[in-house]
């Protein structure tokens, strides 16, 4: 539920290595 400051509209989240996932076109962690 914490925004990672990255969007995933066109490309996947690069922050997935930090535990982030794509939700509603924005990368979130928990």
Swiss-Prot record:
Record bears the keyword Lipoprotein: no
The record's account of how the chain is modified after translation: This is a cyclic peptide.
SUPFAM superfamilies reported for this sequence: Cyclotides
Covalent crosslink: Cyclopeptide (Gly-Asn): 1-30
Domain of life of the native organism: Eukaryota
InterPro entries, per database record: Cyclotide, Cyclotide_bracelet_CS, Cyclotide_sf
UniProt keyword terms in alphabetical order: Disulfide bond, Knottin, Plant defense
Disulfide bonds: 4-20, 8-22, 13-27
GO biological processes: defense response
Bilayer-spanning residue ranges: none
Family: Belongs to the cyclotide family. Bracelet subfamily.
Domain notes: The presence of a 'disulfide through disulfide knot' structurally defines this protein as a knottin.
Function (record text): Probably participates in a plant defense mechanism. Has anti-HIV activity.
Protein name in UniProt: Cycloviolin-C
Organism: Leonia cymosa
């Amino acid at each position: 539920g914490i925004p990672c400051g990255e969007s995933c509209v066109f490309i996947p989240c690069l922050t997935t290595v930090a535990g982030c996932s794509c939700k509603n076109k924005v990368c979130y962690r928990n």
